[in-house]
Amino acid sequence: MKKVILKTSLSLAVAMASTQLFASGLALNEQSISGMGTGFAGRSSAADDASTVFGNPAGMSRLKRQQVTGGLATIDASTDINDASGNQSGTNKGDMVPFTAIPMAYYVKPIDDQWAFGLGVYAPFGLNTDYENSFQGRNFSSKKGEIKVVTFQPTVSYAFNDKVSIGFGPTINRMSASLESALTTPLSPNDGNVQIKGDDIGYGYNIGVLVQATDTTRVGLTYHSKVKYKLEGHTEVSPGAGTPGALLRGARYDASVDFTSPESADLSVTQDLNDAWKLYAGATWTRWSRLKDITVQNEGITASAGGLLAPSAISTIKEEQNWHDTWAYAIGTSYQLNKQWVLRTGLSFDQSPTNNTNRSPRIPTGDRTIFSIGAGWSPTDDLTIDVAYSYLKEEKVKVNNSNQLGQSYSAEYENSANGFGVGATYRF
């Protein structure tokens, strides 16, 4: 009798994001609307508003007034699936990422000429996917998934002088996951179902330095630490109709998985060309090579509770990932049209961490190019309203998956997305 292989979607909970979401690897970029307008070039050196709490906490030293910055970024993703084949029937509609909204909020208060204090609430990771139930590659992909990671970051900065400042903030990160995937075995012609829920709180930090190298050149370096999670929750298994209960039957188990989100470093430069023009450039390194594999541990599995096949099929589930480190590069510019208006644009190039051997419908990502435009309007000295638009286009990539049940799926994926953002900064 063939061994039942249960390919759960808890790996998505660990990876924590859909690659259609303007991601560097799987990390969301939407933490600043003003930064979105320049393609996040100069993320560590711009310090234009309170969102510098995330971009570079040392940048708080440049903000001379108490202020709050908030915003909302929305993402409308599209996926085309072509040349699909497999030994199971099904559909390949694509467009599995629903319309998504990502909020953010920051606060900065200068204490004196040297010290500043700030707070940030933002989403560093996220997921929202929804394949159709009849998806042909359902044994290698989540049917539905929602991951929420919310970070709270209290922050302080210190200016040694008018040239050099540093900043530091611990991060408190809460992740919750709810995922659903298909379970198809030779024991039944009908699909079963696996639903996984879990949550955890992880801790890290964000540290940065900002240097005014010349009167017109500013350099920033920011380091975001790794964060360790231990997702704990439960797995619910519902075999397809007709599956012999003595072999595999519906049950609920305690589940856990250890995961470490990667550290990243961003180096940015802001260059004042004249009174109107600014040039931004940046590079971000992310240590995605931490993600070698994903191992899910399900506890309390016995043959009497789950069927004869349950202990060998469900107790430990391991999926190879073998990701590699990535670099993202960005260049952007802004033009101060007048006292009220600033115009922005940027271009970004972002590597994918996946490889051709292990890539699956769960994370069918390729290298991407992102074009961005934006604007800021300041009707008064106290208020600035920012808007931004980004268009993302990925290279075509192929997935080619098979498992020990003899099931297979291959297809060509092409992803794109439109991102819109609106935010405001109020100074008081």
Protein language model regions, located:
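Outer-membrane beta-barrel pore proteins
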Residues: R43-A47, V53-Q66, Y107-D113
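Surface-exposed strand-loop-strand hairpins of Gram-negative outer-membrane beta-barrel proteins
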Residues: F40-D48, A77-P98
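Transmembrane beta-strand segments of Gram-negative outer membrane beta-barrel proteins
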Residues: L26-G42, S61-T79
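Acidic, glycine/polar-enriched metal-coordinating patches/loops
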Residues: V14
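Outer-membrane beta-barrel porins/channels
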Residues: S24-G39, G86-N92, F99-F428
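Bacterial N-terminal signal peptides that target proteins for export
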Residues: M1-S9
